[in-house]
């Protein structure tokens, strides 16, 4: 959740 690939946007990251 910090901007990695396949991560769900929850803390300010985002999916790629």
From Swiss-Prot:
Query: What keywords appear on the UniProt entry?
Result: Adaptive immunity, Blood coagulation, Coiled coil, Disulfide bond, Hemostasis, Immunity, Innate immunity, Secreted
Localized where? Secreted
Principal localization reads secreted
GO-annotated biological processes: adaptive immune response; blood coagulation; innate immune response
The superkingdom of the source organism is Eukaryota
Its post-translational modification remark reads: Conversion of fibrinogen to fibrin is triggered by thrombin, which cleaves fibrinopeptides A and B from alpha and beta chains, and thus exposes the N-terminal polymerization sites responsible for the formation of the soft clot. The soft clot is converted into the hard clot by factor XIIIA which catalyzes the epsilon-(gamma-glutamyl)lysine cross-linking between gamma chains (stronger) and between alpha chains (weaker) of different monomers.
Cellular component terms (Gene Ontology): extracellular region
Q: How does it assemble?
A: Heterohexamer; disulfide linked. Contains 2 sets of 3 non-identical chains (alpha, beta and gamma). The 2 heterotrimers are in head to head conformation with the N-termini in a small central domain.
Instruction: Tell me the function of this protein.
Output: Cleaved by the protease thrombin to yield monomers which, together with fibrinogen beta (FGB) and fibrinogen gamma (FGG), polymerize to form an insoluble fibrin matrix. Fibrin has a major function in hemostasis as one of the primary components of blood clots. In addition, functions during the early stages of wound repair to stabilize the lesion and guide cell migration during re-epithelialization. Was originally thought to be essential for platelet aggregation, based on in vitro studies using anticoagulated blood.
Query: Domain comment, in the record's words?
Result: A long coiled coil structure formed by 3 polypeptide chains connects the central nodule to the C-terminal domains (distal nodules). The long C-terminal ends of the alpha chains fold back, contributing a fourth strand to the coiled coil structure.
Name of the protein: Fibrinogen alpha chain
């Amino acid at each position: 959740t910090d901007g990695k690939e396949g991560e769900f946007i929850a803390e300010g990251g985002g999916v790629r």
